[in-house]
Regions:
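Nucleotide-activated chemistry modules centered on ATP-dependent adenylation/adenylyltransferase
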Residues: 1-259
Length: 259
């Protein structure tokens, strides 16, 4: 891929396999990097934070770089339970539903406020600040077999035809293994994400019981605050408490087969 050496090169690093592979290959191929941006939701797996720390120690510091952490000043749970709703139409709709005019509730398919407020907005704001002083190029780690690219962004993995499977192997080959996180979960997004698979949630309960207990508490609070509405539903088909009962029953049944 062609590189503009006069530009300011900003790399987005989520910490996942694709963005990590992109960063590794950019460094190996001698591509310029001026900033590495990380949007922290505050709800990542502990192994992901350890991985990001390792990336900074092993890859960035010796090159005079560091992670630029981007965080919402209030955080995920404040947005979920406490953020005031100002728009009149929103307040009227909530009045009809009988829910308070604060808190976003669980993210939904149509309204993924978490991605918007905790990731996209923060990164775009930072990149726009950079663009006020520099001609900036923004690099995103999307694999060749993922969704289509957007305009005005740089997608090295697509240009290099690197698939998701290849991206993960690139990381493994260079000693970045997330302490086995990708062997447990196909995708390593926020541990509280309601869009993850049932199998992922079952794995969360088994391998991260402290996070599972936190998720139970969040869902109980959401149901109490927002009731039987989309805002109060972790998933359309299950509450976390119901999933907890289901997984417990499945584990007990499996234990009987193993006897």
């Amino acid at each position: 891929m062609a590189t503009d050496k006069t530009a300011f090169h900003a790399v987005s690093l989520s910490g996942g396999k694709d963005s990590t592979a992109m960063l590794l290959l950019m460094i190996e191929r001698g591509l310029p990097i001026d900033a590495v941006l990380t949007a922290d939701t505050g709800m990542e797996f502990p192994e992901m934070y350890e991985h990001l720390d390792k990336v900074e120690r092993v890859l960035l510091r010796e090159r005079g770089l560091h992670l630029t952490w981007l965080r919402h000043e209030k955080g995920f749970e404040w947005l979920m339970f406490n953020q005031p709703k100002q728009k009149e139409k929103t307040r009227q709709l909530r009045d009809k539903l009988g829910v308070p005019n604060y808190g976003n509730g669980w993210p939904g398919i149509r309204v993924r406020w978490c991605t918007g407020q905790l990731k996209t907005h923060l990164i775009e704001k930072k990149v726009n600040q950079i663009k006020q002083e520099h001609h900036a190029l923004h690099y995103i780690g999307i694999a060749a077999d993922e969704r289509q690219r957007m305009k005005n962004l740089q997608y090295p993995l697509i240009d290099w035809k690197i698939t998701e499977k290849q991206a993960l192997q690139i990381c493994y080959d260079r000693g970045f293994d997330w302490n086995g996180l990708y062997k447990l979960y196909h995708r390593c997004s926020c541990w509280c994400c309601p869009f993850q698979s049932i199998e992922n949630l079952k794995t969360l309960r088994r391998h991260h019981p402290d996070l599972w207990q936190h998720l139970l508490q969040m869902d109980e609070r959401a149901l109490a605050q927002f009731g039987n509405t989309p805002l109060g539903h972790f998933r359309e088909d299950w509450t976390v408490a119901q999933l907890d009962q289901r997984f417990d029953a499945e584990d007990r049944q499996m234990s009987l087969f193993e006897m």
